[in-house]
């Protein structure tokens, strides 16, 4: 029997676990928190205030115990922690174990995460799963569509693991474009939240989303991905969801900045992603004004309206420059 391990006991990890349960397979959750592991083992796996959610997942805190015998490992922890699990995966799993990245962002030097894993693990069975998906809706079995990028074996494995009449899985061979699109949607969501918080109107939000998509496409192509990926589930799909809803942490953070409101959740991936994206863009001589705007948004005493005006006062140009 195949053993599925999900690294990360947060909302997204448990949401993916709930989808695996639909296939009559019990996934194992690896978490660093003994309390969280205990909660999951006692059916309290949901991070949401919903007593109807009872997931029969198994969890533990010892990498060796959880990872040994795994045929699939899904990384669903914060992107900053993903690379810290490379050694454990290498030590306690078969060298051909499939590894799926469900976290969104860049490495600490702007690297593309799945490419780092391929190199460090000496394993070609690396994939990325992405797309428009709030964890709560996946857990509640609301219709959702995701894309998995990888080789044919990864696509088949992931489809067998997750695909149902509530969770559709589409395949892609573009690991680079899928990974970058997932990181960039958080960047554009922050910008969209700021525009919304400044009451600049729906026209402006539509413009931010569309031009943010153009910036993403530029970066994807520049780093070796496929232009078309940006117009799929990992790109426009996820970007639209995250840029138009207060359920998105990154959108909510941008909105809170604009309104000068306190923000409790410190997991805002888009700020770091913006800085890593600009690092890559500068190497490639790419223009990414919205992304660059997001890099400075957390500076003290910054007037966001003035920064938006700077973007609007840029010289006119063609919509698409190849």
Annotate each PLM feature:
Residues 1-61:
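NAD(P)+-binding Rossmann beta1-loop-alpha1 motif at the extreme N-terminus of oxidoreductases
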Residues 7, 11, 15, 35, ...:
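Conserved active-site and cofactor/substrate-binding residues in soluble primary-metabolism enzymes
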Residues 53-55, 60-141, 160:
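Rossmann-like NAD(P)(H) cofactor-binding subdomain of soluble oxidoreductases
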Residues 106-201:
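Rossmann-fold dinucleotide-binding core
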Residues 140-149, 153-164, 168, 205, ...:
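Catalytic phosphate-donor-binding core of small-molecule kinases
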Residues 142-147, 176-221, 232-249:
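Active-site-proximal catalytic alpha-helix in oxidoreductases
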Residues 192-193, 221-231, 235-322:
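NAD(P)-dependent Rossmann-like dehydrogenase/reductase catalytic/cofactor-binding core
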């Amino acid at each position: 029997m195949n053993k599925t391990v999900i690294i990360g006991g947060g909302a997204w990890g448990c949401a993916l676990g709930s989808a695996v349960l639909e296939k009559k397979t019990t996934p194992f959750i690896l978490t660093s928190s003994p309390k969280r592991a205990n909660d999951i083992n006692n059916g309290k796996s949901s991070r949401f205030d919903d007593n109807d959610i009872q997931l029969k997942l198994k969890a533990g805190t010892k990498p060796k115990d959880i990872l040994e015998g795994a045929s699939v490992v899904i990384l669903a922890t914060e992107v900053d922690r993903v690379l810290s699990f490379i050694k454990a995966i290498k030590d306690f799993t078969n060298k051909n174990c499939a590894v799926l990245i469900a976290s969104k962002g860049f490495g600490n030097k702007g690297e593309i995460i799945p490419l780092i894993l391929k190199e460090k693990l000496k394993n070609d069975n690396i994939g990325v799963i992405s797309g428009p998906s709030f964890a709560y809706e996946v857990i509640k079995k609301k219709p959702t569509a995701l894309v998995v990028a990888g080789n044919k074996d990864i696509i088949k494995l992931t489809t067998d693991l997750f695909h149902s009449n509530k969770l559709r899985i589409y395949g892609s061979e573009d690991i680079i474009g899928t990974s970058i699109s997932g990181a960039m949607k958080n960047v554009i969501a922050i910008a969209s939240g700021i525009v919304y918080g400044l009451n600049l109107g729906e026209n402006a939000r539509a413009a931010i989303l569309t031009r943010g998509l153009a910036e993403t496409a530029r970066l994807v192509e520049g780093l070796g991905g496929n232009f078309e990926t940006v117009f799929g589930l990992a790109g426009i799909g996820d970007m639209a969801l995250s840029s138009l809803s207060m359920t998105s942490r990154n959108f909510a953070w941008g909105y809170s900045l604009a309104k000068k409101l306190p923000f409790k959740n410190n997991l805002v991936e888009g700020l770091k992603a913006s800085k890593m994206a600009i690092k890559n863009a500068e190497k490639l001589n790419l223009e990414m004004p919205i992304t660059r705007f997001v890099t400075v948004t957390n500076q003290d005493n910054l007037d966001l309206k003035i920064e938006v005006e700077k973007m609007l006062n840029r010289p006119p140009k063609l919509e698409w420059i190849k």
